[in-house]
Design a protein with these regions (language model features):
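Bacterial Sec-dependent N-terminal signal peptides
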Residues: 1-22
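Intrinsically disordered, low-complexity regions enriched for glutamine and histidine
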Residues: 7, 19-20, 267, 713, ...
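C-terminal outer-membrane/trafficking sorting elements
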Residues: 9, 674-676, 736-822
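Short, compositionally biased serine/threonine- and acidic-rich segments at solvent-exposed termini, linkers
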Residues: 716-733
Length: 822
């Protein structure tokens, strides 16, 4: 039997800084008082892969017990790495999420193999809901509802399938583990000493993990790596620098009045390596279902779509409406995630964004800002070395007469965690624009956090720091030039509550092409279904403003927001310092293993980080729906001063019938043939393009933190619309479809494998080669039919992971992995 032990992990110590708590040894029942010192409730976890199954074993020794100050006699239990239930009317039992990357999570089975528990007479406290960023502290907690007496034993099962999120061909399964069960009627608490469970798949998982290669998608690679190994490096078979086709399609959904600006933008993205498609209708009939159906049809026609951009306000392209979690207070909210979730609410087929504009001029302003940011970045080094953090010290949990100098929320603490990581490891200069009420004396961070020292830095104590940050300070810094602007506090449709920065302040910005990316992590500032919200105002602003902004369309939840913010910064600047720690939601996670700079991926990385913190499905789904990328999801932020390619003039060479590119560093290399209106793009260090007319070919070489290098061919249109890259309308066959493998259908119920592909050249020699993951050839299919969505079938492949590669005239066009199980 093949075994692969991935890790035996002890979860980090938690510092306990609260009185009235005690440690319980689960097996013996002995307790001891806790003082202001570090204390351990560390479970162990062993994860191993055995053929087609994953086996997870937990062992628990101690649990911490504390009083519920709102319900005398009730208790909270705490185990490091597990969080308290936060669903109202439920008992506050402990749970965590285990995440696993799988080829097909829909077909897996989960079985409990072993478990042991000890029962105690401990009354569990009612669950407390998460706080929003628009409410004070105690009113919300006091609203925590009593436990529903009809629940019985909760949870019924201590290991549960919580569903999965799909991104491309990888499913990330979430499994909830409960070391505590509560008998509500009899007030009996089962505390488990051992939980062992198994996930059974229909393919060899070891072989599957060895075959994974997601180097074109850093977010997916980070998630897969964590889900497989929790930080253990994965050895990919393919070299990172091996040249391969860059297959990334980009779909833009809009209406005709924005077409001029959209076409120019689509042409630019084509140069940057995206096969762009425009989906336009005179009217979307105010129907999100109509929009989604059209996107679904486009995705079936172009299955390599990875980015979705909506251009237009909700009056142009509607957004999906849902009830908020507190509908009686906050009504409905809108989301565009609906359009990226084609298969289910848990799937997300593309990275998505919206440029919400209401006129052709606004569309031109915003899209041109994005093009210029990528194409001609500013040369001022100070712009890339500076950021601003805007936050509020909230200390009003007990009324003005009982302020205690401790921060009630995490606004300042989250800002300082991020600032410390960015300044100490990456050398950025981050200005603090902080505000506190004049009567407040900021001295300590919230004791809900886990840290060795709760004192604010000395430089933040009064009178060393004035705590009077305002809109004028923000305007001054942005006008001087900052790479990013971060806000953590309460928010509203008009803007930031404290330090106050609203639409009228944006009118005073004149930062020109020094355009920051804005992280507006608060409530409501991205509510684009009303008349010009803060995010729309910031993005649309001419002669400055921002180039992209993340913001929420409804009220958002405080701890989720703190985690989201740290996860987003960790996507750009990976650092262990960006692992935020709460007492009752302590993560078992690691920093991102690989940075990503694309806005849509940055948001997705933050969303995945929230999943690692064990928030309930209800809160996770809600947070994922409300936070949006206002801007281009494919745009890459310049995380440092951009530089030109070394010896770029010699990178591109042309002969009579061949163009060769050698970059010496990992790049996206794109060829646009202006004579035949064809498009090819590759990732790697070198690429070539065969043509009888090399002077008509435009070449673009791009890479993160590099200024794009463009060699224009004859008839190139570098500042307008390249008239190819289809506009999709009622004729689904409009436009050019790139050659490549489209989809592979295989089933555990059949030995037949269907391979769908696009092959548009009649006079060519083409074949499909099937290999195993180690590169050993298994089958060659010759004499391929040509056309869009052509197909061939084969049978009798052995069980396991295979790779199908389309070869045309001796050149690799594209490849796709697939699994066969019998």
């Amino acid at each position: 039997m093949k075994r692969l032990i991935l890790i035996v992990q002890s979860i980090l110590l938690v510092a306990v800084f609260a009185s009235g708590q005690e440690m319980l040894n689960i097996a013996t029942g002995k307790t001891e008082a806790l003082k202001l010192s570090k204390a351990s409730t560390i479970p162990t976890r062993e994860v191993e892969i055995v053929d087609n199954s994953i086996i997870v074993a937990y062992n628990f020794t101690n649990v911490m017990i504390s009083e519920d100050n709102l319900n005398p006699g009730s208790k909270f239990l705490k185990i490091t790495g597990f969080c308290n239930e936060n669903t109202p009317t439920h008992p506050s039992v402990l749970t965590r999420r285990d995440l696993f990357a799988l080829p097909n999570a829909n077909d897996i089975k989960i079985r409990l193999l072993e478990s042991d528990f000890v029962e105690y007479d401990i009354p569990i406290a009612p669950a407390r809901p998460l706080l929003t960023d628009s409410e004070d502290l105690f009113d919300t907690y006091a609203d925590a509802k009593p436990i529903d007496s009809g629940i019985g034993i909760y949870p019924e099962s201590i290991v549960n399938n919580e569903g999965y999120e799909s991104r491309r061909n990888v499913d990330v399964l979430s499994v909830s583990v409960f070391p505590i069960q509560y008998d509500v009627k009899n007030k009996k608490t089962r505390i488990y000493t051992k939980i062992k469970y198994e996930i059974v798949a229909d393919v060899d998982l070891r072989q599957y993990y060895e075959s994974l290669d997601s180097t074109d998608d850093p977010v997916l690679e980070n998630v897969v790596t964590k889900a497989i190994s929790w930080g253990t490096a994965i050895d990919h078979i393919d070299s990172l620098y091996l040249t391969k086709p860059n297959i990334q399609d980009y779909l833009i959904v809009t209406v005709p009045k924005y077409m001029r600006a959209v076409k120019r933008f689509a042409s630019w993205k084509q140069l940057m390596g995206f096969n762009t498609h425009i989906l336009s209708r005179d009217s979307w009939n105010n129907s999100p279902d109509t929009v989604k159906h059209a996107i679904q049809n486009a995705y079936e026609q172009y299955p390599d779509i990875k980015y979705l951009l909506i251009v237009g306000d909700v009056e142009d392209v509607p957004a999906k409406q849902y009830e908020s979690l507190q509908n009686n207070r906050h009504g409905y909210f809108v989301t565009d995630r609906f359009y990226a979730s084609l298969n289910s609410d848990n799937s997300c087929e593309f990275y998505y964004g919206r440029v919400s504009v209401s006129s052709a001029q606004e569309a031109a302003t915003v899209l041109n800002k994005i093009i210029n940011y990528e194409k001609s970045p500013v040369t001022d080094a100070s712009f890339y070395n500076n950021g601003i953090h805007c936050a509020y010290f909230q200390d009003d949990n007990s009324g003005n007469d009982r302020r205690d100098n401790y921060e009630d929320r995490w606004f300042i603490q989250t800002s300082e965690i991020i600032r410390d990581a960015i300044t100490s490891k990456f050398g950025k200069e981050v200005a603090r624009i902080y505000y506190a009420e004049p009567a407040v004396n900021p001295e300590f961070y919230s004791t809900e956090s886990v840290r060795d020292d709760y004192n604010l830095p000395t430089e933040l104590h009064r009178p060393n720091f004035s705590w009077d940050g305002d809109g004028d300070d923000i305007i001054s810094k942005i006008n001087n030039g900052v790479l990013y602007a971060f806000h953590r506090d309460h928010g509203e449709i008009a803007g930031w509550s404290q330090p106050e920065f609203k639409g009228q302040n944006i009118d005073s910005l004149n930062n020109g092409n020094k355009l920051p990316v804005v992280l507006s992590i608060n409530c409501l500032s991205g509510k684009f279904n009303v008349d010009t919200c803060f995010a729309e105002k910031f993005l649309r602003h001419n002669n400055g403003g921002c180039v992209g902004i993340f913001a929420a369309t409804c009220v958002s939840y405080s701890r989720c927001n703190d985690v989201l913010a740290c996860g987003m910064f960790d996507a750009i600047w990976p650092s262990d310092k960006l692992i935020i720690k709460f007492h009752n939601i302590t993560p078992e996670t690691i920093a991102s293993l690989k940075p990503t700079y694309r806005l849509g991926q940055i948001l997705a990385q933050g969303m995945y980080r929230m999943s690692e913190y064990n928030f309930s499905n209800e809160f996770l789904t809600y947070q994922k729906r409300i936070f949006h990328c206002h801007g281009d999801p494919s745009m890459q932020i310049y995380s440092r001063v951009p530089t030109s390619f070394r010896r770029q003039e010699s990178m591109v060479t042309k002969s009579d019938n061949l163009i060769q590119v050698n970059t010496r560093s990992l790049s996206t290399i794109t060829f646009i043939d202006n004579k035949y209106h064809t498009f090819k793009s590759y990732t790697g260090t070198e690429a070539e393009y065969s043509t009888a007319y090399p002077d008509y070919v435009t070449v673009c070489v791009a890479a993160p933190n590099k200024i794009p290098y463009i060699v224009a061919g004859k008839h190139a249109i570098l500042d307008g619309y390249i008239d190819f890259g289809p506009i999709i309308d009622d004729n689904p066959n409009n436009g050019m479809i790139a050659d490549g493998i489209v989809k592979i259908n295989s089933s555990s119920n059949s030995s037949t494998v269907e391979i769908k592909y696009n092959l548009n050249s009649l006079a060519c020699s083409a074949s499909i080669i099937i290999t195993n993951v180690f590169g050993n050839k298994e089958l060659t299919i010759n004499n391929l039919p040509t056309g869009n969505n052509a197909s061939v079938t084969t049978q009798n492949l052995p069980s396991g992971i295979h790779i199908a590669t389309l070869v045309k005239d001796g050149a690799i066009i594209g490849s796709l992995r697939f699994a066969v199980s019998k």
